[in-house]
């Protein structure tokens, strides 16, 4: 397929009031990403004090951490279908209330069971936001800036994680000797939940979703608020043509043809699952969830680890900012394949340093910290933003939220498994064995991405959809 065919038929994007309004919508919607980041990152510093107060062993720690990820898998899968039925905006408003009450449950949890319940509620909201917010942004964005606009959500995710690390360090070092200090760490996340709820009440629905459910006038009205009038009318017409082509395909599908229709969905779904699960297999959340444990294993004291843990969070934000600048300049495939190759390289360096540097070497924790920061920087620059953008772009409109939900489900399930297993693995084989394992897996994923990942940069969602359905978008078609 031609990546430029849509560019040649649509009027120029232009700038003005509509561009500023689109930016405001993106800012409000990405509060879901901020909550996603804070709620996944807060456990990093809260785990040690809550373990002491509630008498948690390593198994309980794994369940408190992993319960969010497993619930997020369910949230991602369920909210894809919910947003298809009720709309992206309505679903995000509902998620904001779950964020709020999940945080309150954690704040007032008297025991591990209630804490896991609160973390499960937060997980449902985190997973739902991870599936719905990127789709909402992708459906609002013009193709020229879709990567950078959709990628802002991941910037807010890592911004939320950094905020959690800073809050953890401040509260932990100033009031760490007091009971219940971890409750204040959780209490902070009620504030952006309120902001998301209030903000989304003033945000319009996705015009693509409105068209899919037959609300053309509303869709055109929304599109005119975020595009010039000429561009809005042209985009609406293009979306309608694609929907009509889909309807024709469905009506004509029978016998062998219906198997072919199912075949294109299975193929792109397998790619989406690879993208979603692969991100987690980088081992990034071994640092974002268990950074304090990893840094203590490297040789830092608990108070020093709380402060040192801010460094990976900071580089994650800087890497995401750089990634947003690269998204419209570098092909998605290049970003992803480079990302998995570079993370594998730093995995090997971390494992080597851990094995070769003796535990009593004063430089050991600092060398490992630098290598961990390099790993996080490479991953966040090349993979984190691009992963969520790609998953939001891959699927045709009528299965977009469901496909995104299943892809995110695979990622969150892998996240949950690693969250449960990592403390045990770290205790059994240390940093060396853990990161050698990650390195081997990431080399394999890089090869799979090279063979199977489509290129979606610089192409409208409707053009991607046509390429997915006729197979021309894949590397094997000779386009890349």
How should each PLM-predicted stretch be described?
Residues 225-235:
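Short intracellular "coupling" helices and adjacent cytoplasmic loop segments at the cytosolic face
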Residues 234-238, 418:
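A short, aromatic/hydrophobic, helix- or strand-capping loop or linear motif
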Residues 243:
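Short Cys/His-rich micro-motifs in 6-15 aa windows
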């Amino acid at each position: 397929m031609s990546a430029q065919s849509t560019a040649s038929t649509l009027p120029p994007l232009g700038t003005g009031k509509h561009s500023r309004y689109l930016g405001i919508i993106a800012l409000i919607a990405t509060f879901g990403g901020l909550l996603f980041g804070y709620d996944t990152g807060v456990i990093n510093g809260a785990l040690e004090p809550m373990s002491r107060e509630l008498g948690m062993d390593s198994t309980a720690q794994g369940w408190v951490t992993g319960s969010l990820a497993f619930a997020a898998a369910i949230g991602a899968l369920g909210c894809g279908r919910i947003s298809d039925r009720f709309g992206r905006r309505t679903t995000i408003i509902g998620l904001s209330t779950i964020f709020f009450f999940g945080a309150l449950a954690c704040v007032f949890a008297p025991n591990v069971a209630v804490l896991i319940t609160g973390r499960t509620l937060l997980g449902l909201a985190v997973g739902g936001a991870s599936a719905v917010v990127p789709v909402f942004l992708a459906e609002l964005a013009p193709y020229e800036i879709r990567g950078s606009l959709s990628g802002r959500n991941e910037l807010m995710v890592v911004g939320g994680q950094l905020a959690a690390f800073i809050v953890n360090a401040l509260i932990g070092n100033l009031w760490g000797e007091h009971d219940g200090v971890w409750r204040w760490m959780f209490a902070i996340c009620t504030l952006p939940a309120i902001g998301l709820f209030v903000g989304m009440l003033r945000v319009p629905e996705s015009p693509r979703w409105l068209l899919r459910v037959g609300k053309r006038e509303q869709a055109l009205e929304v599109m005119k608020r975020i595009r010039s009038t000429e561009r809005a009318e042209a985009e609406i017409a293009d979306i309608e043509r694609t929907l009509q082509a889909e309807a024709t395909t469905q009506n004509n599908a029978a016998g062998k043809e219906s198997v072919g229709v199912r075949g294109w969905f299975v193929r792109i779904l397998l790619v989406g699952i690879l993208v979603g699960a692969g991100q987690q297999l980088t081992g990034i959340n071994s640092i974002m969830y268990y950074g304090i444990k990893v840094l203590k294993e490297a040789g830092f004291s608990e108070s020093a680890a709380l402060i040192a843990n801010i460094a990976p969070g900071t580089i994650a934000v800087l890497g995401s900012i750089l990634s947003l600048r690269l998204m419209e300049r570098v092909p998605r495939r290049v970003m992803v394949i480079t990302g998995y190759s570079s993370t594998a390289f730093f995995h090997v360096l971390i494992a080597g340093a851990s094995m070769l540097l003796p535990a009593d070497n004063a430089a050991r924790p600092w060398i490992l910290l630098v290598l961990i920061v390099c790993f996080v920087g490479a991953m966040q620059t090349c993979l984190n933003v691009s992963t969520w953008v790609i998953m939001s772009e891959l699927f045709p409109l009528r299965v977009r939220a469901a496909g995104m939900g299943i892809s995110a489900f695979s990622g969150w399930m892998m996240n949950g498994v690693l969250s449960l297993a990592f403390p045990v693995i770290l205790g059994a084989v240390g940093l060396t064995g853990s990161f050698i394992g990650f390195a081997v897996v990431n080399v394999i994923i890089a090869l799979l991405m090279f063979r199977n990942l489509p290129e979606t940069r610089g192409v409208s969602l409707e053009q991607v959809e046509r390429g997915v359905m006729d197979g021309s978008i894949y590397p094997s078609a000779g386009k890349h």
